Amino acid sequence: MDLIQRPRRLRGSETLRKMVRETRIDKSSLIYPLFVREGQGIEEEIPSMEGQFRYSVDRLPYELERLTKAGVSNIMLFGIPDHKDEVGSGAYDENGIVQRALREAKKQFPDLYYITDVCMCEYTSHGHCGVLCGHEVENDATLELLAKTALSHVEAGADMVAPSDMMDGRVRAIRECLDKAGHKETPIMSYAVKYASAFYGPFRDAAGSAPAFGDRKSYQMDYHNRREGMKEALTDIEEGADIIMIKPAMSYLDMVSEVYKATNVPIATYSVSGEYAMVKAAAKMGWIEEDRIVCEMAASAYRAGVSIYLTYYAKELARFIDEGRIG
């Protein structure tokens, strides 16, 4: 047949396929989420997230060593306190779990890059992401506490803060607080487009952050909405966000693509606990090839426009990159 264009010509060998690959993935763009908890000598597996653990501060360096050897240099820290109260005071306590973990980690592994999740839900007795007035989350009263939390993280050694609470105005409040304290160069990665998703279930088990009543639909986004997500992203950029995150990843790559096209800031996405747990469960049953699925999910996120990928599979992806299986 007289064909001028034969797309298969560029698929003829692995070398050629890699040469013309449109999406490039590098280990430096991976972020690994880590859970730190109170106690001593603790390295406990999370039942709903096989292969993921909660670490006490004294055990955290062992995992940081493993990450360093894997070539993963970016960490997102989540704290699990023993004490919880109505206003989440442990979140901004200078001797809180995240603050102590940061100081210890920075002492032993100063070359790693530490990002902290800024929210109240792990620290409040009611499990909501802010201060309550009756059964409603009081937006403006929460902003000061979020800003105090972010500042306490930075002063303990955080290189970047990532507010995940979805309160209106939180980026501005944090930016102004950090600037006033002399931290003008500390970037903010905002969970700007965070949907009220069923994919968060295993995380809430891991962090002990399930709400005691109701849900988070009054502050997290309705998953039916696209234009609202764009509004959230643009608002956070105006308030000073340096990086915009879309969360979850797999079901929201349309939003990744939309925000990527409409803005000029780096885009991140978080492949969340439910996505991880689904892959693990299906792989355990022998229904899927875990490694190939992990690579395919990551590539789809980068293809949609992300330059930063938060994933519980960061160590595995780093190995796959080294082996030439992705990237």
Where do the language-model regions lie?
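N-terminal amphipathic/basic leader segments beginning at the initiator methionine
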Residues: 1-21
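Alpha/beta enzyme core
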Residues: 13, 25-31, 37-327
